[in-house]
């Protein structure tokens, strides 16, 4: 079901910047986004970047000790959101970083909001080619490390964001 909602150019630019890892200086790496939250504009016609709802790679270890916990804390309790999260995890063989796309639709969100976000999900996903991991979370219990590790590769995952699972 299409909603007719558009996706802002800035959303596409942020996705591209997060997906493409070009050789960068240490300062440029610190400015790269670790997580970004997107919301609907006030008129509900466009998906935009939510002001102030991002984590920069340079914040991790400096002002943010647990980036995933901080990311979960940025999600509203009673409304829906989309998000991109640059997940760092380890398998038994190697260390990996992959983008995850989230639809956050908590139980307490208004029904109309859930319907608009669900019906607009395809519009934003089409702007994010190559996303390997898509996840819908309906409450904080869906966003624990075990659930995310399962989504990323199940028993092959030994650590997520530096913490054992």
Curated annotation (Swiss-Prot):
The keyword Acetylation applies. Residues 4-153 form the ADF-H domain. Widely expressed. Not found in skeletal muscle. ISGylated. The keyword Ubl conjugation applies. Gene3D superfamilies: Severin. A motif (Nuclear localization signal) lies at residues 30-34. One of its GO terms (cellular component) is presynapse. The modification Phosphoserine is found at residue 3. The modification N-acetylalanine is found at residue 2. PROSITE patterns: ADF_H. The modification N6-acetyllysine is found at residue 19. Transmembrane segments: none annotated. Keywords: Acetylation, Actin-binding, Phosphoprotein, Ubl conjugation. GO terms for biological process: actin filament depolymerization; actin filament fragmentation; cell motility; positive regulation of actin filament depolymerization. Belongs to the actin-binding proteins ADF family. Actin-depolymerizing protein. Severs actin filaments (F-actin) and binds to actin monomers (G-actin). Acts in a pH-independent manner. This is Destrin. It comes from Mus musculus. The lineage of its organism: Eukaryota, Metazoa, Chordata, Craniata, Vertebrata.
């Amino acid at each position: 079901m299409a909603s007719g909602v558009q996706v802002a150019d800035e959303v596409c630019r942020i996705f591209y910047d997060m997906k493409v890892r070009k050789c960068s200086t240490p300062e440029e790496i610190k400015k790269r986004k670790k997580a970004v939250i997107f919301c609907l504009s006030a008129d509900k016609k466009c998906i935009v970047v939510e002001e102030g709802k991002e984590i920069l790679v340079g914040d991790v270890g400096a002002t943010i000790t647990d980036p995933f916990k901080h990311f979960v804390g940025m999600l509203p309790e009673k409304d829906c959101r989309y998000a991109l999260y640059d997940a760092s995890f380890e398998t038994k063989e190697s260390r990996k970083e992959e983008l995850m796309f989230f639809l956050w639709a908590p139980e307490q969100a208004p029904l109309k909001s859930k319907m608009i976000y669900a019906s607009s999900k395809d519009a934003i996903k089409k702007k994010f080619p190559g996303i390997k991991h898509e996840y819908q979370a309906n409450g904080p219990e869906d966003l624990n490390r075990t659930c995310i590790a399962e989504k990323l590769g199940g028993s092959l995952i030994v650590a997520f964001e530096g913490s054992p699972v």
